[in-house]
Design a protein with these regions (language model features):
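Iron-sulfur cluster-binding cysteine motifs and their immediate structural context
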Residues: 18, 58-75, 83-107, 125-155, ...
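Feature captures the FAD/FMN-dependent oxidoreductase FAD-binding
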Residues: 109, 170, 175-179, 227-274, ...
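Glycine-rich dinucleotide-binding loop and its adjacent helix/turn
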Residues: 153-170, 228-245, 269-323, 429-445
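N-terminal Rossmann-like FAD-binding beta1-loop-alpha1 element of flavoenzymes
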Residues: 175-200, 313-321
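Rossmann-like dinucleotide-binding cores of NAD(P)H-dependent redox enzymes
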Residues: 198-241, 290-292, 317-364, 486-493
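FAD-site-proximal beta/loop scaffold in flavoenzymes
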Residues: 280-301, 365, 385-459, 499
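A conserved FAD-binding loop/helix module that cradles the flavin
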Residues: 316, 452-483
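Mid-to-C-terminal Rossmann-like scaffold of FAD/NAD(P)H-dependent oxidoreductases
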Residues: 347-353, 361-373, 478-541, 547
Length: 636
């Protein structure tokens, strides 16, 4: 009997092999190409997590021989799932919803959805670091949705009708002072003015916008874009006083302001104290970018070296090219993979001619007749910070070399000027660089004084500063006697979306740019808009993770299944698990068609019960095991 079973098993295996050889070619992504794949470990059975499945049909479409059959209702259930893009956005912008509206051709409605959460949709459409895209489930199939570009597209199709639904409460008689007219301060001021408070923003510079105006070059964020948003903020009643430096928070309180928000940006740059750092030709990134933005005469040499591999470093490098530099290098301590700049910024910089030198430490600035001539460097194996926070660098002996330069720009960090809180014992700072606040309320230790933005976090994302401004506005409104409800409903009520077909393979479009030759001769914006057809097609790629079409029927025909696991790998929600003995069990049950009741995951069995550790240890190195722990109810 045993040999008979062995014979049946061998015959069955040969038939599966033959079936695989005869079936048509299939295009898929293997682990070497697809770094973030769903769990395909082999545990005890085939399991399907009903709570995680939204009925997107991805598994059925990925199956090469159509053994999965799904039936879902025509309309979705809304409100029980938060899409990853929505959940990841610091400001809580509902990206899934506005992307869906763009797919439906409702572009102005999409912009209204964005404006429900932020007063800077155009700014974010141009320069947002888009953490939402990093979490986009579509990226598990092919590529994430170009959410930032779609945000810009929506802004470009604004019809202004959202203003008719905007909130504007009657005057409260309360006065608020905002120190710093950057993204955090202006966001807070915008919402506080809508709550009826009299808001005055004090800006030490001659122009409004803070770091988004003087820290981000015009070719990335044209000034007219910022001006449009500032005009909207002024329209709701925010008064902005330029060229006004606040020396003391206490004085503002004595002048009759009921609450103060400290939202000064990180305008103070850092210079590494290297030998020779006092030579002519040394610049600081923040000063350099600010002077260029203010239209001051700024000269750079023919050869420029930027020390620092973050986005600011590449902003300096690309700005130097536009000012006439012939050779621009970015050198940094981090490895190429560990560089702090975004992949987009590095790619665009190199395309424009910036040379990148990662894994470098710096020993001294060389000079000739009082002017810089280069920077002496060492190649670096690795670096780390010890328990005291001191940098430990493992340099390669004998690797000394000089990067020639007429101008050296330090872009190695920046922090806020906090002289206005000096001597105030109630307001605590961290080494005089950032202000300690309550994380939720943004309140400092002094009654009536709040802080937000880079003054609290250090250099951070624009969207993070906007989110901090929202939080501060809520807390300050409550402090001033309001209810803290700054939410608005600006977009029309969305009709219940109907089900669409499962996703087909389609990659994100290339964002258009102006020609390279034109880029280097002007500060004109380099990135262009998506055309309407491309924008709609891109929005249609969205998996609509915030909508749940709970399957009424979900079955797997094991008579045809070839146990390839593509259904599991393709599921963007980790709703399927391949069991350790699933294939063997299917051999014994050739006529078995598994219904959803048969494969529904047993909540009593922990995720670890679905994989076999011995098999997991022997999986190829490129295979990723994602232990599918519950991350919280309602998260897709």
């Amino acid at each position: 009997m045993r040999f008979e079973r062995y014979g049946i098993g061998i015959a069955k295996g040969l038939s599966v092999t033959l079936r695989n050889l005869l079936r048509g070619p299939i295009t898929t992504q293997y682990p070497e190409q697809k770094l973030d794949i769903s769990r395909r470990s082999r545990g005890t059975k085939l399991a399907w997590d009903e709570d995680k499945c939204i009925g997107c049909y991805t598994c059925a479409r990925s199956c090469p021989i159509s053994v999965i059959e799904i039936e879902t209702p025509e309309t979705a259930v809304q409100g029980e799932i938060v899409a990853p893009c929505h959940d990841t956005c610091p400001a809580g912008v509902d990206a899934a919803r506005y992307v869906r509206l763009i797919a439906q051709g409702k572009f102005a409605d999409a912009l209204a959805v964005i404006r429900e959460r932020i007063p800077f949709p155009s700014v974010c459409g141009f320069i947002c670091a888009h953490p939402c895209e990093d979490k986009c489930n579509r990226g598990k199939i092919d590529q994430p949705i170009t959410i930032r570009a779609l945000k810009r597209f929506a802004w470009e199709h604004d019809n202004g009708l959202w203003r008719q639904k905007g909130k504007q409460l009657p005057p409260t008689g309360k006065k608020v002072a905002i120190v710093g007219a950057g993204p955090a301060g202006l966001t807070a001021g915008y919402y506080l003015a809508k709550q009826g408070h009299k808001v005055t923003a004090f800006e030490s510079l001659s122009i409004v916008g803070g770091m988004i105006r003087v820290g981000i070059p015009d070719y990335r964020l044209p000034p007219r874009i910022i001006d449009d948003e500032i005009d909207e903020i002024k329209r709701v009643g925010v008064e902005i006083k330029l060229n006004t430096k606040v020396e003391s928070v206490d004085k503002l309180l004595k002048d009759g302001y009921d609450a103060v928000l400290i939202a000064v940006g990180a305008h103070r740059g850092v210079k590494i104290p290297l030998p020779g750092s006092d030579l002519d030709g040394i610049l600081i990134a923040t000063d350099f970018l600010r002077d260029v933005a203010l239209g001051k005469p700024v000269k750079v040499g023919k050869r420029v070296v930027v020390i620092g591999g973050g986005n600011v470093g590449f902003d300096c490098a690309r700005t130097s090219l536009r000012l006439g530099a012939e050779e621009v290098r970015v050198a940094c301590l981090e490895s190429r993979r560990g560089m702090l700049a975004s992949a987009e910024e590095i790619e665009e910089g190199e395309h424009e001619g910036v040379l990148v030198h990662p894994s470098h430490s710096f020993t001294k600035i060389t000079g000739d007749n009082g002017h810089v001539s280069g920077v002496e460097c060492l190649d670096v194996r690795s670096f780390a910070f010890d328990k005291d926070g001191k940098l430990q660098v493992d340099s390669i002996p004998g690797s000394e070399h000089i990067l020639p330069a007429d101008t050296i720009i330090f872009a190695v960090g920046q922090w806020a000027e906090l002289g206005l809180v000096e001597g105030m014992d109630e307001i605590k700072t961290v080494r005089g660089r950032t202000i300690e606040v309550d994380e939720e309320t943004k309140a400092t230790g002094k009654k009536g004084v709040f802080a937000a933005g880079d003054a609290v976090t250090g250099t951070d994302l624009v969207i993070t500063a906007i989110a901090a401004g929202r939080k501060a506005a809520i807390a300050m409104d409550k402090y001033l006697g309001g209810d803290g409800d700054i939410d608005e409903v600006l977009a029309p009520v969305e009709a219940m979306p109907t089900r669409v077909e499962g996703p087909r393979e389609a990659f994100r479009p290339e964002i258009p740019f102006i020609p390279l030759k034109e880029r280097l001769s002007t500060f004109k914006g380099v990135e262009l808009s998506l055309e309407e057809q491309l924008a709609v097609e891109e929005a249609e790629r969205c998996l609509r993770c915030d909508l749940a079409y709970h399957p009424e029927k979900y079955q797997v025909d094991t008579r045809k299944c070839i146990f390839c696991g593509l259904c599991v790998e393709s599921c963007p929600f980790d709703a399927l698990f391949l069991g350790y003995v699933y294939e063997q069990a299917a051999y014994r049950n050739q006529e078995l068609v598994l219904q959803k009741e048969d494969i529904k995951r047993d909540e009593k069995v922990p995720p670890s019960g679905y994989y076999h550790p011995e098999v997991a240890e022997n999986l190829p190195k490129q295979t990723l095991l994602v232990y599918n722990e519950k991350k919280g109810k309602g998260k897709a």
